[in-house]
Design a protein with these regions (language model features):
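Alpha-helical residues within the helix-turn-helix
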Residues: 20, 31, 60
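Short alpha-helical DNA-recognition segment
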Residues: 23-42
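DNA major-groove recognition helix of helix-turn-helix/homeodomain DNA-binding modules
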Residues: 53-68
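Short, basic-rich loop-to-helix N-cap that marks the start of a DNA-contacting helix
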Residues: 47-57, 76
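A short, Lys/Arg-rich alpha-helix, primarily the initiator
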Residues: 1-21
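Residue-level signal for the short linker/turn that defines the boundary of a DNA-recognition helix
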Residues: 13, 24, 50-53
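Short, charged recognition helix plus adjacent turn
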Residues: 2, 60, 70-79
Length: 79
């Protein structure tokens, strides 16, 4: 798998983990963020490249900053 795809999968996994940690279903979180549920699912699987604007929206929904979601989950636990 190309490095770019590996990083997208890691990012998507962090987003999924944080969403679940906060108790949101995929559908509820997508609605909260104003995203389509299927789009969010593709982002979480790493099969969709996420734009900076969408990443900001997702981080707002997760109440974390971009650095937190891109560096890894241990930083989320400190919130």
């Amino acid at each position: 798998m190309p490095l770019k795809n590996v990083e997208l999968v890691k990012l998507g996994g962090r987003i999924r983990y944080a969403r679940k940690l906060l108790g949101f279903s995929q559908n509820d979180f997508a609605t909260k963020c104003g995203l389509d549920r299927s789009y969010l699912g593709r982002v979480e699987r790493g099969s969709r490249n996420v734009t900076f604007d969408v990443l900001c929206t997702i981080c707002d929904g997760l109440t974390c900053d971009i650095a937190t979601i891109t560096r890894g989950i241990p930083h989320l636990l400190a919130l």
